[in-house]
Curated annotation (Swiss-Prot):
Gene3D superfamilies: FAD/NAD(P)-binding domain. The lineage of its organism: Bacteria, Bacillati, Actinomycetota, Actinomycetes, Micromonosporales. Its EC number is 1.18.1.2. Homodimer. It is an enzyme of class 1 (oxidoreductase). This is Ferredoxin--NADP reductase. Its cofactor is FAD. Keywords: FAD, Flavoprotein, NADP, Oxidoreductase. It comes from the Bacteria. Pfam families: Pyr_redox_2. One of its GO terms (molecular function) is flavin adenine dinucleotide binding. It catalyses: 2 reduced [2Fe-2S]-[ferredoxin] + NADP(+) + H(+) = 2 oxidized [2Fe-2S]-[ferredoxin] + NADPH. PANTHER family: THIOREDOXIN REDUCTASE 1-RELATED-RELATED (PTHR48105).
Amino acid sequence: MHEVDIAVVGAGPAGLFAAYYAGFRGLSVAVVDALPEPGGQITAMYPEKLIHDVAGFPAIKGRDLVANLVAQAAPFAPRYLLGTRAEKLSYADGRPVLGLAGGEQLHCGAVVITGGLGSFTPRPLPVAERFVGTGIIYFVPQPADLTGQDVLIVGGGDSAFDWASTLQPLARSVTLVHRREKFRAHAATVARVHALPVRVVVNAEVTRLHGGGAVTGAEITVRGGAAELLPVDTVVAALGFTADLGPLAEWGLRLDRRHLVVDSTMATNLPRVFAAGDITEYQGKVRLIATGFGEAATAVNNAAVVLDPAAHLFPGHSSDET
């Protein structure tokens, strides 16, 4: 059995900052995540990709951001329960008890759920499934592995354009294909790629891949036109992910689709259960890493008052510490 003041469910950026902030408030904290390493989707999907919208960093690699967050929390010795899924939520004497995979229990004063979008599965590129692992990938753990290759990126969101700008200096060629004329990606991200020697093909789909054991080419068909065969070594299918809340969906939390509804204190409908980061929903919600950091601090501060009603909601600035 484990016992802490705050149990953080999810070791992505918001969860790691929640761990720091709990320590800053003098609270003991445990971080639970089903993945074997901290960092959530950043570590799992794009550790080498540059992130441009974190305050104070013009650009920072995903793995470096995660390393900095872990280092920031380290002085407070958070307990990491990685490779461990939080399966159940119950209460004992009014306090939350998390049932962990494997049968262990984590007793705590409050829970802060920072599980991102839950567990995630890449949306498949139908014509490419037989090449998974031999030329079709859904994220790029090591961009250097694609040095000198002809790379085809499929998708129109931020991930597709981020991979295009990351891989362009390394690859022999980069082609980005999107089935629509308009993109979901941020306008600045699109403009950055258009300024690079990246071929962008719109209103088009990948209709066939060529190759024996590995991909050697791809047929691209523009709407109303003929197919064009491109030489391709690697296809990056950046088509987004389907999310699954997993056991969280059975905890009795109020949901808005796959998100947890919270109030201005980041409290959910369950006693002593708060949430922060991409998993939350409220009017005007914007899903950014930067937003998640503020929500994590709000959740922890309000949880601290629940644990000790005599405590101040605002503990002071970290710069006041000597």
